A protein has these predicted regions:
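Helical subdomain adjoining the active site within ATP-dependent kinase catalytic cores
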Residues: 296-300, 313-368
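ATP-binding pocket architecture of kinase catalytic cores
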Residues: 37-215, 228-232
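Juxta-kinase regulatory segment immediately upstream of eukaryotic protein kinase catalytic domains
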Residues: 2-34
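Protein kinase-like catalytic domain
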Residues: 93, 155-159, 238, 256, ...
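Catalytic activation segment of kinase domains across protein kinase-like and atypical kinase folds
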Residues: 226-254, 263
Length: 368
């Protein structure tokens, strides 16, 4: 699969254009150090919040910024919360976690049509292909190890100390999220997916015991990070739209979904020759995370539940993308392809439930 379609910028599509003069005026008043003639382009990657590259051409050498905004049109409740993105980025930047420098949040729809925020444009590598075909074995391992280090760092930050104690509701995260994504999925439903119906019925009744609360990213994956141009070092973690206070295992298992999705399907690496490529096995990756966070070994059924939940959640997210294509509000020409993955992801989620049932550690499955 070629990832060229996602890389770089493109001219701003008609439905995503806005008044650059009003934006320029806002930036002069709210963005420290900004001056010059503003040029605007749109990033190709992503299907969620429209993201723009802003270039202040009049400054010495030019200065680049990134603008993230809500998409136009009718939106699902609580979706596209760019104000929450800005809040968590600002808090984490203050304690040295790798995020772009935040500049300003604008909640006035009258400036460019929707709420938006502006942050620094971090220059580096965005790696889209988890196979990393142009890297050596040791280089691949170093990239995966850095991803592991950074998500472990996130989950060990004291959310109260960084002012995020009201960023979400502590406790009962999985229960609330299953309810939320059930509602979001049902609001976006365009076809019947039997595996999703089964997950909706089974998951709330089988939540594992034990609860923890940390800052969670919600979409931590390779292509939501920017690596140093030459070093295996993350300079910035991007796309905090789904961030909240939640259970770290739910967040980490989401990050590990790739080991459960066949290679070539939706960022999957299942079936790849891990040792040959220098990619850690899932268990090796879990062990690294546990060591870095001071966590004991994770119960297999607890892990499988979290994996089932996350495959259910991402199926719901992709179904939301499919619905936005139908409604005409999707912000990417490739959103239709992403939205079509919902049935596959739901089936993979149900496979995790079947593993739990074979161990005899979950309630009987609904009739299929």
């Amino acid at each position: 699969m070629s990832f060229d379609q996602f890389v770089g910028t493109k001219p701003v599509e008609e439905r995503h254009r806005f008044d650059t003069a009003r934006l320029d005026q806002f930036m002069r008043s709210n963005v420290e150090g900004y001056s010059g003639t503003l040029e605007v382009a749109m990033f190709k990657g992503g299907q969620s919040n429209p993201t723009y590259k802003l270039t202040a051409g009049g400054q010495a050498g030019g200065k680049n910024y990134v603008l993230r905004k809500k998409p136009p049109g009718k939106l699902l409740p609580s979706a596209h919360a760019v104000d929450r993105e800005f809040r968590v980025i600002k808090a984490l930047h203050g304690v040295g976690f790798p995020v772009p420098r935040p500049y300003a949040l604008c909640e006035d729809d009258g400036v460019i049509g929707t709420m938006f925020y502006i942050m620094d444009c971090v220059e580096g590598r965005v790696l889209w292909d988890q196979a990393m075909p142009d890297m050596t074995k040791s280089q691949r391992f170093a990239i995966w190890d850095e991803l592991n280090r950074v998500i472990a760092q996130l989950h060990t930050i004291d959310y109260k100390a960084v002012g995020l104690e009201t960023f979400g509701k502590p406790g009962s995260y999985l229960e609330r999220q299953i309810g939320r994504w059930t509602k979001q999925y049902q609001a976006s439903e365009t076809q019947k997916i039997e595996a999703m119906d089964n997950l909706i019925a089974w998951l709330p009744k089988n939540i594992p015991a034990g609860d923890e609360t940390t800052v969670v990213h919600g979409d931590f994956r390779l292509d939501n990070t920017i690596f140093h141009p030459t070093e295996p070092r993350i300079l910035a973690v991007l796309d905090w739209e789904l961030s909240t206070l939640g259970h770290p295992l739910a967040d980490f298992s989401y990050h590990c979904m790739s080991w459960h999705i066949p290679a070539g399907k939706f960022r999957g690496i299942e079936g790849m020759p891990f040792e040959e490529l220098g990619i850690p096995t899932e268990q090796q990756y879990i062990d690294l995370y546990c060591k870095r966070t001071g966590r004991a070994a994770i119960d297999p059924s607890t892990w499988d539940f979290n994996m089932a939940y996350n495959l259910f959640r991402i199926a719901g997210i992709t179904q939301g993308i499919a619905k936005r294509v139908v409604d005409g509000t999707a912000s990417s020409a490739h959103a239709l392809e992403a939205g079509s993955k919902a049935p596959l992801l739901a089936e993979l989620g149900w496979l995790q439930v079947e593993k739990i049932l074979r161990r005899g550690t979950g309630e009987r499955a609904p009739s299929r």
